[in-house]
Amino acid sequence: MCIFVDMLIDTHCHLYDEAFRDDFEAVLARAREAGVEACVMPGIDRSCHDALLAVADALPDFAFPCIGLHPTSVGTDWEEELAFVKAHLADQHWYAVGEIGLDGYWSKDFLKEQIRVLEEQIVLAADAGLPVIIHLREATEDFFRVLEDLRGVVLRGVMHAYSGSYETYRRLLTYADFKFGIGGVVTYKNAGVASALEKMSLDDVVVETDCPWLTPVPFRGRRNEPSYVRFAAGKIAQIKDLPLDSVAAATTENARRLFKL
C-alpha cells in the first residue's frame, strides 16, 4: 500500500535512539518524502538526555524535545531521576513533560513509586503550562485514582499508544483535555482499539509511531521509523471512512495546538 500525504506530525518518536545511528539522514529523508513535517520526541530518563538534545539542536524545526521520567525507568534511584527532571525543566523550551505514566506489565515492584513520580510530574507540567505524554499499561484504575487525586490540576496531553475502549476514552475526557495517540498497533489484526476509534472524535486523535518500536503492518517485525506514521493515518481513514487527507489535516492541527508547534 503506497500512502503519501502533504502533512503529518509524528507525536511520539524516539529519533535519538541508537537504532537510527547508522542511517539517520536516510530516515529523515524518507520521513520528509512521506509528508512528515515534525516529530515530537519524548524523554525516557537521564541516560538519553544528551542524545535527545543533540537531535533537537540539529533539527530545530523538525524534532521537538520533551523531558520526563518513563515509568519503567522508576527503580531504586527514582529520586535521583526525578530530581534530574526537576533540575532541567527550566533549562530550555520543552514541548511536553513525558514520557510519564504507569506500567504494571513488566513489573509491579515499583508501582507505588511510579504513582508518586507520575503525580509529581503532572504537577510540574501544569505549573509549567506544558502538556503531558502518558504511557499507561496494565494500570488503568491506578491512573484514574491519580487523576481523581489531582482533580484541581488543569491537565492536557496525549494518551500515548492508546489501546483502550470507547468507554475508557469517554471517562478519561472527564478528567483532562486528552488527545489519543494512534500508532502502528491499529494496523495489527484484531487490534482492539479499532472498535473504539470508530466512535472517537477525530478532534481527539493524533498519530504517532513510537519508533523504533511498534512497527505497523506491512513492516511489522522491522525497525519502525517516522515515515511509517502514514500507515497509522491510513488505517484511521479506513476505519472512520474518511479521506486520508482529512485525517492528516485534522491530526496535524490537533498536534500543533496541543504542543504549540
Protein language model features and the residues they cover:
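Mid-domain alpha/beta scaffold segments of enzyme catalytic cores
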Residues: 2-261
